[in-house]
Amino acid sequence: MSYCRQEGKDKIIFVTKEDHETPSSAELIADDPNDPYEDQGLILPNGDINWNCPCLGGMASGPCGEQFKSAFSCFHYSQEEIKGSDCLDQFRGMQECMQKYPDLYPQEDDEEEAEKEKQNKEAEPSVTQSSDTKEESSS
């Protein structure tokens, strides 16, 4: 016999094997585009930027969040023929802020160099002889 249990915001439904064998009669409910908690993607239906989109990777809420929002908004709403060409000051401001926090915003060059150094260290032979061993082998 199937039954349902509510735990906080979650509804847990226990079903039997027979329940699984019969076709579902559940009706799907259309998503509410005005639901503020519903993931809408980067651009909301009204054309605004969804600063809570996980696709931004938290950039809008970090220590340089305001600079990021300024630069990204400028680019998004840019009407220039070369989109974003009117946003250089905002992007420079964002870059200057990010350079103050290299641990949070590593530059691609820094990441590539660190990876190359790591690979070089792993590839180097780590065999060293002590001076005692060298003397014994030469006698």
Swiss-Prot record:
GO BP term, pick one: mitochondrial disulfide relay system
Localization (cell): Mitochondrion intermembrane space
Motif Cx9C motif 1 location, chain numbering: 64-74
Pfam families, A to Z: CHCH
Composition skew (Basic and acidic residues), residue ranges: 115-124
Ranges in coiled-coil conformation: none
RNA-binding is among the record's keywords: no
An example molecular function term from Gene Ontology annotations: protein-disulfide reductase activity
Disulfide bond sites: 53-55, 64-97, 74-87
Keywords recorded for this protein, A-Z: Disulfide bond, Mitochondrion, Oxidoreductase, Protein transport, Redox-active center, Translocation, Transport
Subunit structure: Monomer. Can form homooligomers.
General function of this protein: Central component of a redox-sensitive mitochondrial intermembrane space import machinery which is required for the biogenesis of respiratory chain complexes. Functions as chaperone and catalyzes the formation of disulfide bonds in substrate proteins, such as COX17 or MICU1. Required for the import and folding of small cysteine-containing proteins (small Tim) in the mitochondrial intermembrane space (IMS). Precursor proteins to be imported into the IMS are translocated in their reduced form into the mitochondria.
UniProt note: domains: The CHCH domain contains a conserved twin Cys-X(9)-Cys motif which is required for import and stability of MIA40 in mitochondria.
Protein name: Mitochondrial intermembrane space import and assembly protein 40-A
Organism: Xenopus laevis (African clawed frog)
Lineage: Eukaryota, Metazoa, Chordata, Craniata, Vertebrata
Name of the gene this protein is made from: chchd4-a
